């Protein structure tokens, strides 16, 4: 549930810029992060962090102001977005030992398979499902080029 479903225009307008930024973060299910340079926003969706085009995100934020009929300007929207970038988690580099699949993440170091998690910081996924090897199947005999492919 979004805080914008129950908040009034008066409540929102009375908030500080940082409080507005936090409500926007909550609206996005706390699934936002900023890159190491503090500029690019990403949203966690379906196992990966996807970069949000800045103008599209600004328009979405303006839409939240409009939803409440709260007055805004491009400067106010930019201020809230810039403040949001200071509050949300900073993206980490994905571990080189992890391979993302549609149905989860394979840890190549220990061979374990895990459900997707924002903490994996994956930016891409292979567009196939991972299936565990059948009895007798090995990378050496059934996929000898696998490690070169990586």
Regions found by a protein language model. Name each.
Residues 1-140:
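Intein modules and their embedded homing endonuclease domains
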Residues 144-150:
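Glycine- and acidic
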């Amino acid at each position: 549930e979004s805080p914008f479903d129950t908040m009034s225009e008066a409540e929102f307008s009375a908030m500080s810029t940082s409080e507005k930024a936090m409500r926007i973060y909550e609206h996005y299910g706390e699934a936002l992060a900023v890159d190491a340079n503090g500029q690019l926003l990403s949203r966690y969706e379906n196992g990966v962090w996807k970069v949000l085009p800045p103008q599209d995100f600004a328009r979405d934020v303006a839409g939240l102001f409009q939803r409440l009929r709260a007055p805004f300007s491009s400067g106010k929207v930019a201020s809230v977005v810039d403040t949001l970038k200071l509050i949300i988690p900073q993206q980490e580099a994905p571990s080189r030992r992890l391979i993302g699949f549609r149905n989860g993440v394979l840890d190549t170091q220990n061979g374990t398979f895990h459900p997707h998690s924002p903490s994996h910081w994956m930016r891409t996924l292979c567009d196939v499902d991972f299936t565990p090897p059948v009895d007798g199947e090995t990378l050496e005999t059934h996929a000898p080029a696998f490690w070169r492919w990586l």
